[in-house]
Amino acid sequence: MTRIVVVDNHGQFTHLEHRALRDLGVDTELIDNDTPPEEIDADGIVLSGGPDMDRIGHSPAYLDLDIPVLGICLGMQLMAAELGGRVGAGDYGGYADVTVSIEDESDPLIGSLAPETRVWASHADEVKELPDGFERTATSEVCNIEAMSDTDRNRYGVQWHPEVAHTEAGEEVFENFRDICAGD
C-alpha cells in the first residue's frame, strides 16, 4: 500500500489533506514539520499550507528526500523559494473561487483536469518565478503560476486547496499524486 505523509505547516485545512488521502485508501500519517527528515518512511510527502514561511520547520529538508513531493499553497511557495524560484505578494489576496486553466494535459498531477477547473485558492502570497527545472502547468486571471511541476524530480505544487469541498476536482489531484507515489 502506498504511504504518504502530510506535513503540518500549521494550515487550517491540513487535517482535510490527511483525510482526503485516507479516504482514497492511502496509508497516511499527519506529521509535525519538526519531524527529522531521516525519520520519514514514506512513498511521498504532502507539504501542507500554512500561515507563513516563519513556521515551516524542517519542510525545506524534506525536499532533499528521494520521494515525490506535493506542495499545497504555502507548500508550493516554500518549494519554489527553496529551489531557486521567487515568491511574492499576490495581487488578489485572500480566498476566492477561481477558474484555473490547465496548460499541460500530459502533466501527471493536474493534466487530467484540462482544459480548466474551478478551485478554492488563497493568493496572499504566490510563486512569481519558477525554479529551474519546473514548468508552469496552470494559470488563472488572478495568479500567473497556479501550479508547477518538475516531473524529473517528482516535485509538484498547486496554489489552490484540493482538499476543500469548493475545489471541484480536488480528489482527482490526490488520486493522481497517489499514483505518482505508487509509480503508476
From Swiss-Prot:
A GO CC annotation given for this chain: cytosol
SUPFAM superfamilies hit by this protein: Class I glutamine amidotransferase-like (SSF52317)
Active site, per annotation: 73, 161, 163
Keyword flag DNA damage: no
Stated name of the protein: GMP synthase [glutamine-hydrolyzing] subunit A
An annotated Gene Ontology molecular function: GMP synthase activity
Organism of derivation: Natronomonas pharaonis (strain ATCC 35678 / DSM 2160 / CIP 103997 / JCM 8858 / NBRC 14720 / NCIMB 2260 / Gabara) (Halobacterium pharaonis)
Protein role: Catalyzes the synthesis of GMP from XMP.
Biological pathway: Purine metabolism; GMP biosynthesis; GMP from XMP (L-Gln route): step 1/1
InterPro entries found in the cross-reference section: Class_I_gatase-like, GATASE, GMP_synth_GATase, GMP_synthase_A
Catalysed reactions listed for this entry: XMP + L-glutamine + ATP + H2O = GMP + L-glutamate + AMP + diphosphate + 2 H(+)
Oligomeric and partner information: Heterodimer composed of a glutamine amidotransferase subunit (A) and a GMP-binding subunit (B).
Keywords, alphabetical: ATP-binding, Glutamine amidotransferase, GMP biosynthesis, Ligase, Nucleotide-binding, Purine biosynthesis
Annotated EC: 6.3.5.2
Entries under Pfam families matching the protein: GATase
Disulfide bonds: none
Stretches assigned to the Glutamine amidotransferase type-1 domain: 3-184
Cited PANTHER family: GMP SYNTHASE [GLUTAMINE-HYDROLYZING], GMP SYNTHASE-RELATED
